[in-house]
Regions:
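Short helix-capping and inter-helix turn/linker motifs at the boundaries of alpha-helical repeat units
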Residues: 99-101
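Short linear motifs at protein or domain termini
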Residues: 1-17, 23, 27, 158-169
Length: 169
């Protein structure tokens, strides 16, 4: 079953589950967890730590719910995200591009959690994943167009008539 799961399914599941996780966390997160969450934002500004800080950000939020089923759900979705080659490739193609959007979205989630606003936290998390889903669609579309261009270039070479006008005197 794991091989049949794609990046869109994982991302949709993450959006739905982590949206609710964020809503719960807005009412349960403590000061120490908020401080650790803030540190992940600082770490994300350093390109060396983006992936690790991103994962930690989401884990801290899940852990702050104190709900083991939610924590396990988030952990399992991260395992799917990082253990299926196709999903890894799809995520890498969009997550490595522009960190500023992810950082901005994480800041919005952090602010909602800090203010204790469950609705705002859910909405901020949904916005974060909606952008990711759209970026995944853009990446898949670009790959498909590149493949079409590659195939057309092969055919162009196969069917084009060579220009012989320079050989005529």
């Amino acid at each position: 079953l794991q091989e049949k799961v794609n990046a869109f399914e994982v991302t949709q599941a993450r959006a739905l589950i982590e949206g609710e996780v964020a809503a719960i966390a807005a009412t349960t997160i403590n000061e120490e967890e908020l401080a650790r969450l803030h540190q992940t934002l600082v770490d994300m500004e350093n390109s060396q730590f983006i992936a690790a800080a991103d994962k930690e950000f989401h884990q801290i939020i899940a852990n702050s719910t104190r709900n083991n089923a939610m924590i396990l759900s988030v952990e399992n979705l991260w395992k799917l995200r990082s253990s299926t080659p196709e999903i890894i490739e799809d995520y890498d193609s969009v997550c490595s591009k522009d960190n500023s959007k992810t950082l901005s979205e994480h800041r919005a989630i952090y602010q909602a959690l800090k203010s204790g606003d469950a609705t705002q936290a859910r909405n901020a998390m949904h916005s974060h994943f909606n952008r990711l889903i759209n970026a995944l669609f853009d990446a898949v579309e670009t790959r498909a167009l590149d493949e079409i261009k590659r195939k057309n270039d092969e055919k162009r070479g196969l069917y084009s008539i060579p220009d012989t006008s320079s050989n005529i005197r």
